[in-house]
Every structure is written in structure tokens, then in C-alpha cells.
Amino acid sequence: MPIPPPPPPPPGPPPPPTFNQANTEQPKLSRDEQRNRGALLQDICKGTKLKKVTNVNDRSAPVIEKPRGSSGGYGPGAAALQPKGGLFQGGVPKLRPVGAKDASEAPAGKPALQVPSSRAAAPRPPGSAASGRPHDDTDSNRASLPELPRMQRPSLPDLSRPNTASGTGMKHSSSAPPPPPPGRRANAPPTPLPLHSNKAQAYNREKPLPPTPGQRLHPGREGHPAPPPVKPPPSPVNIRTGPSGQSLAPPPPPYRQPPGVPNGPSSPTNESAPELPQRHNSLHRKTPGPVRGLAPPPPTSATPSLLSNRPPPPAREPPSRGAAPPPPPPMIRNGARDAPPPPPPYRMHGSEPPSRGKPPPPPSRTPAGPPPPPPPPLRNGHRDSITTVRSFLDDFESKYSFHPVEDFPAPEEYKHLQRVYPSKTNRAARGAPPLPPILR
């Protein structure tokens, strides 16, 4: 059988020579056709003479030059180019003089240009409103009209914002044009900054965001407005009013220290220094009532934690702890529902959480000093883990209804049977294995 297959390949090669012969024979037979083909190829290679059209260049030039060169002649043309990309080519350079001089170009009567001018004035009022809202009455009046076009075309203001920022920089000499938000913050500090800082801190505790640390950096640099932000924390919780009045001196350092070293690992060491006086204060306050001892640590720990790199976890935990300070177990349940494993390790990381977990169990351990804090959090962590497991089981059982054991049928009686496996039997009993089949 192996011998016959080779013969078919030899007959295969003959066909290719036939194709080669055919290819070679065709040009020999049709030399006239080759000449015609050569002539066609020459014509194709030469190509047709193209006329140099200058009108195309003239057409393209005025489309770009119309909005740029003619400031007042092509009012309708500019209006027609609004939805296209030409608006940004012509509108962007026109926004700069509009931001600098609104009264001079207002009588020109260009509805298409007035809308971007109003947009240029629009981003300022929200910044002033966020800082304190008593900034400019004229800007607030202008903001009412341009808000509608903004909603209709959200993409336009995004592209024109850098120019509008430069236009606003002309009016506000103290603000830096490239970053509008910090510029707006820099404008407000003289009068409305304390109000703005109070609102910012109350909002930061609820939802910490990246821009908010920037707002805190400004009051921290000025130094004077730092104490007023310390006062608003006691307002939300009545329990903090007493300790806050006495602990006004220690809190300012945590506000001023984090800006200097916010990201470094030495931040906990800096935070530990202000915590010590507060711990002493908490010890002195525990004599009248232990509830006050619970209250002071959360504010101190909440403020530096918000300034730390990981704002979300502290934001989730403080509200649950502040919601019901007296009963610790329910607060831990809330934490366990969100993420059971993280709470114990999170308490292990920082020095502040030990202060949180430290006061509740026994007041007698606290006077021992700074060395004992590590062991209590470990014990509290184990207790909390047990309580979280129990509470989780209770909640799990309460959600579902289980059948009693009596409802299920009785299991079948177990009968011991000796099972025989052929692989475990002796070869002698099985006999000799069969001979392998003979290959033919």
C-alpha cells in the first residue's frame, strides 16, 4: 500500500509546465496586443493633465477667514456656523474681548456672540455662591439668563472654559486664571470665607471629596480662620458642646499639621501628639459622666481621618458611631453589614481607633498611659468580632423561616454491606490475564 501513493505526484507536475507554456505562448501569438497594451500602459502612466484650480484655495480661505477677520460684517454667517466646528475657530478669539469689555461690544447687536459672553460670566456666579454669595449682584443677574443655553449645549462651555477663565482673570486681578476653583476660593477669604469653611467642613464629613482638602488647605495656610472651623463641629451633636469649649486649644494643631504632612507615614505621629491632651481631658470628664468620654474622641479622629488619603472608610464609620454612641453593639452591626472583615484591621492600623474603642469598656484601664492602648483594641476587636458574628446569625435567622426537624422524613437505616471490588481481588482467583490481540 505505501508504494502506490508516490506515483500520483509525478503526474501532478506536468500541468504546471502547461500553464507556463500557455503564458509564454500567448505573448508570442499576440504581439500586436502587446503593443496595444504597452500604449495603454504608457497613457495610464502619463496620466491626464490636471488644471491648477485656484478656486479651491480661495473657497477654503474665506471659510476660515470670515469669522476671524470680519468682526461685525458676517453676523448671520457666524450664527450659521454655531453648530459646526467653525464656531470654536471664530468664537474663541471673540470671547476674550467680550470677557474684557462687555459694555463696548454690547451695542454691536450680535445674538450669537452675546450667548458666549453670558457663558463667560456664568461660571463665576456659582463660584461666588459657593464662597458666600454676597460677591457680585450683577453676576448673579447675568447667571439667571445664561443657565438655559448652558443646559441646551453642555459641550460648548467645556471647550470655551479656558478662555472664559482668562476673561474672568481680567476682572478679578487677585485670582489665578488657569485654575478657576482655587481662584474663586482665593477671592472670598477676606469676608465670607469663615461661612464657606463652615459649610465645607459640614459637607466634608458627609461626603469627602478631592476638592474639599484644597479648601481646607487655604484656611490652614491663613492661620486666622482656622479656629472658627473648629467651633462648628460641636453644633451637630449636643454632647460635644461641653468638651469642645474646653478643648479649643488642642484641636487647631491637627488642622494645621495635616496640610504640612498629609500623605507621609509620619501623619499618625503628628496626630498622636494632639490626642494625648484630649485623652487627659477625656479622663477628667469621665468622672461626671462616661457619655462625654465617648463623645470627644470621635471628632478628633474624624477630622484628621478626613484629611488622610482614604476618606471613604472613615466617612462610613463615623456616622454609624455618631448615630448611637451609648450602645456599641448596634453600631458594630452596621459596620459588619457593610463589610465584616475590615473593621478589626482598620482599628489595628491607626492610633485613633484605639482611642475610640478604649473608653467604653472600663474607665480604670485608661489612666495607665499610652503603652496599654494596643492590648485593649485587640480584646475589643475579638469581642466585637464575636458580637458581630452573633448579630449576623440573629439577623440571618430572622430573615428566613426554617422548618423544624420533625417536618423532615427520617433517614433510611444504615445497613453494612461488604462490597467486592475486582481490582482488590487476588490475581490467582481472577486467573491469568487474556493474551493481547494479534495484529494482522
Swiss-Prot record:
Please note every region of biased composition (Pro residues).
Answer: 1-18, 176-193, 225-236, 249-262, 356-378
Where found in the cell?
A: Cytoplasm, Cytoskeleton
UniProt superkingdom: Eukaryota
Entries under PROSITE patterns matching the protein: WH2 (PS51082)
Compositional bias annotation for Low complexity? 116-132
Q: Name one GO cellular component term.
A: cytoplasm
- Protein family: Belongs to the verprolin family.
Asymmetric dimethylarginine (modified residue): where? R37
| Segments for region (Binds actin) | 49-52
Q: Which gene encodes it?
A: Wipf2
WH2 domain boundaries: 36-53
What is the protein named?
WAS/WASL-interacting protein family member 2
Q: Which molecular-function annotations from GO does this UniProt entry contain?
A: actin binding
Q: Does the keyword Cytoplasm apply?
A: yes
The reply to whether Disulfide bond figures as a keyword in the UniProt entry is: no
Sum up the protein's function in the record's words.
Answer: Plays an active role in the formation of cell surface protrusions downstream of activated PDGFB receptors. Plays an important role in actin-microspike formation through cooperation with WASL. May cooperate with WASP and WASL to induce mobilization and reorganization of the actin filament system.
Where does the record place the region Disordered? Answer: 1-38, 56-386, 419-440
Print the keywords alphabetically. Actin-binding, Cytoplasm, Cytoskeleton, Methylation
Q: Assembly state and interactors?
A: Interacts with WASL and WASP, and this interaction results in cytoplasmic relocation of these two proteins along actin filaments. Interacts with NCK2 resulting in the localization to sites of focal adhesions.
Principal cellular location given in the protein's record: cytoplasm
Matching SMART domains? WH2 (SM00246)
